[in-house]
Amino acid sequence: MNIIVNGEPRQATAPITVAQLLSELKLPQRGVAVEVNLQIVPRAQHAEYQLQDGDRLEVVSLVGGG
């Protein structure tokens, strides 16, 4: 299936959840915000939220600082 992650086209094997995609991208499960088709996906739903062909994701890593 074809998805877009942070503006870049990407192939993913279906079915795949947000949590599985984060793992494939080598991103932590905590400290990231995920938006799918302009809707925030709460972290509590990452393991169940199934991505669909054509989904557009924005993944943002949260960084603390001062």
Over which residues does each language-model region extend?
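Eukaryote-biased recognition of intrinsically disordered, low-complexity regulatory segments
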Residues: 1-7
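Glycine-centered recognition micro-motifs in short, flexible terminal segments and loops
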Residues: 65-66
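Short amphipathic, charge-patterned alpha-helical segments
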Residues: 16-26
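Short alpha-helix capping/helix-loop boundary micro-motifs
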Residues: 41-46
